[in-house]
């Protein structure tokens, strides 16, 4: 097996203060895209989840360049996943001295990029 075609680069952001469902709908759009396509998708989408996902994507590309010397033009998004993180539990003051619980969800965003310099099989986005 050719070593150059199997290099994978990963970046993770943990405890992002956002619902995992809201971040997932953005992350699903990135799978199978090249790095440049994913950047343009994230720059034009109007969702709040785009900014932390964009930071993770840029971090993964920087890891590829600095750690392995891979040019950003040869990267594509192999996997973009969003998992649930811990939930911050707080209380909201209400009338008559009561308190109602509120939950502030967090999520973990991880993006895996793959180098396709010697590989001819780039996944086609469906």
Swiss-Prot record:
Please provide an example of a Pfam family that matches this protein in its UniProt record: Ribosomal_L22
Instruction: For this UniProt record, give its keywords in alphabetical order, as a comma-separated list.
Output: Chloroplast, Plastid, Ribonucleoprotein, Ribosomal protein, RNA-binding, rRNA-binding
GO CC, sorted alphabetically, is: chloroplast; large ribosomal subunit
Recorded GO molecular functions are: rRNA binding; structural constituent of ribosome
GO process annotations (BP): translation
Per its UniProt record, what HAMAP family does this chain match? Answer: Ribosomal_uL22_B
Annotated family: Belongs to the universal ribosomal protein uL22 family.
Q: What does this protein do?
A: This protein binds specifically to 23S rRNA.
Oligomer status and interactors? Part of the 50S ribosomal subunit.
**Could you tell me which PANTHER family the record lists for this protein?**
CHLOROPLAST 50S RIBOSOMAL PROTEIN L22-RELATED, LARGE RIBOSOMAL SUBUNIT PROTEIN UL22M
What is the name attached to this protein's record? Large ribosomal subunit protein uL22c
Tell me the gene name. Answer: rpl22
